Amino acid sequence: MNIKFSPPDITQAEIDEVVDALRSGWITTGPKTKEFERQIAAYCHTPKAVCLNSATAGLELVLRILGVQKGDEVITSAYTYTASASVIEHVGAKIVLCDTGEDGYEMDYDKMASLINEKTKVIIPVDIAGKICDYDKIYRIVEKKKSLFKPSNDLQEKFGRVILLADAAHSFGAVRHGKMSGEWADFTSFSFHAVKNLTTAEGGAVVFKNIDGVDPDELYREFMLWSLHGQSKDALSKMKIGAWEYDIKMCGQKCNMTDIMASIGLAQLKRYDKMLARRREIINRYDEAFQGLIIPVEHYGDDFASSGHLYLARIKGIDSETDRNAVIDKMAGCGIATNVHYKPLPMHTAYKSLGFDIKDYPVSYAKYANEISLPLHTLLTDEEVDYIIECFIKAVGEVTKNERPD
């Protein structure tokens, strides 16, 4: 067999939607993008959604709209992909990395609390593998620390505390205590990249909660300005007969979503619940088969359900990169693509150059050293899942010299 790690699930429905966009004569930001925004907002139970070309763009635009700048600090996880932190550098603020907690892949919340000071403006929690972070705990911490918060503009003043921006690149469709991903943090950024549960090839979206004293329509327009060069009209409005006149309000960015991208998303969203259900089936089969072999992510419980984006397995009996990589090699020999999520940021050249040292993040390193991500996607057949299970158990047994490590 040849099993890919995370191929996009594209059906005739997606193809038909894209063809419809191509034939419409309007292929950049237009009616399909606006409809996709409406459907995302409805799905997430939020007043607005802003479609962009990536989750990274979403994170950065939120920081810019909040006025985060040089002299400010933003806290995020050391155990994440670079996008969670690089956007902080982009706006000129200081990156503050927090080690992982012993349980799961979220930040160590006690350490996170200790990192908050008068310069802290935003915290970016990361929903690793599709599981929503413990926002009850996070909100308690920022409320307790609100006396330290020093707003530098009117929008920050509206919050009166450190602002929460969810890196929810993995968690679109996840639920916690009856609330959707997108309903928890003040702002939430989703990814629709090709490897994500719901894809638009490239793409992302920002949603936000109602903020006291802030008109959601005005906030939406602020995102529109930032996403299209600060232009007062989008392309669709500007192209109406006789309506060419526009203004550049500020020097914005260029990160809008196109109707071709939105077309894929509209088709995916129609069948997304079934896609989530299939992911849950595969996760349940993995969990049952690997009892005693790994430390898994707890994706489902009485009052929460992740989006089932990644199957992260920490292998018992392995505590080194060398042995973990040996398992990866054996899986490759079986024709199975695997991955590692994540190499902690302090191990990368860019973050070393900023002064970070992995020795200061021992829990993140320990989780990384024995973690392997198995294929988890909606194109997997039951036969392929059985084969992955068989090969993984065998590979781990050969490396650990123990078929079922305790």
Predicted regions and their residues:
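A short alpha/beta connector and helix-capping loop motif
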Residues: 106-112, 178-188, 387, 392-394
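Conserved active-site segment immediately N-terminal to the catalytic lysine
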Residues: 152-199, 244-248
